Amino acid sequence: MDSAVSTIMTGVENLRIALQDVPGFRTVASAPYMFRPFIMLVFLGIAAGLVGVIVNLRCMEFNAEAMVHSVFPGIVAGALYWGIDNIVPGAAIVAVIVAIALTWLGRSRRINEAGTAIVLISFFGFGIVLSLYKGDMSGQLEALMFGRLLEVSDTRLVQSILVCLIALIAIGVSWRAQISRASARDGAMAAGMNATAVDFLANAAIAAVVVASSSAVGILLVVGYLVV
């Protein structure tokens, strides 16, 4: 993993040096601590832009809101037990569980919203309790919620880029199915579409964007990327 991070960051540093004298890039390319957040925001913007289209077309705003809050315990656990550079893996583990839960709840229109609300409240509440139970989190809790963009490390940048690519793959391979599901839900199911798989890919893509942004933008602000 370390060698892969080193290789990718060497390429990022070479790109930064190449852009130093290019008008419009001089500020962000002036130092590595400025260029890392810039690269992260570029990848996050591309992934969130495409995933956000599906979120709005399929009226999955509440799912996105639930995912944003529900990954919080994974972020807290990753930071407390494995170190700040393991925020993304910790959030990813919880995000997979939440994506499965939201997909299962989405199969029933009757319990969908109520069940989603329960998932949101339960996971987010557990994250708050965990963060307060483990000691003095003054300042740290706010950082986990709203992010610290200029403190992005090489490891977290690479992790976030990889997760953004997962989001793009998940939404890319199911793009046609997602559009069909959005425009004619019942017709798509009558045509033999695997609705559960399509829904899971949509939730997984949302989860990936949330996880990718967790270490920099913060879990609460990413909903603006997906919905607004």
Predicted regions and their residues:
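Transmembrane helix-bundle core of multi-pass membrane transporters
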Residues: 21-27, 109, 116-174, 201-204
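Membrane-interfacial amphipathic/re-entrant helices at transmembrane-helix boundaries
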Residues: 1-46
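Structural signature of hydrophobic alpha-helical transmembrane segments
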Residues: 33-45, 84-96, 161-165, 211-225
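Hydrophobic core segments of alpha-helical transmembrane domains in multi-pass membrane transport
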Residues: 41-49, 75, 96-100, 125-128, ...
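Hydrophobic alpha-helical segments embedded in the membrane of multi-pass proteins
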Residues: 46-50, 68-72, 96, 196-208, ...
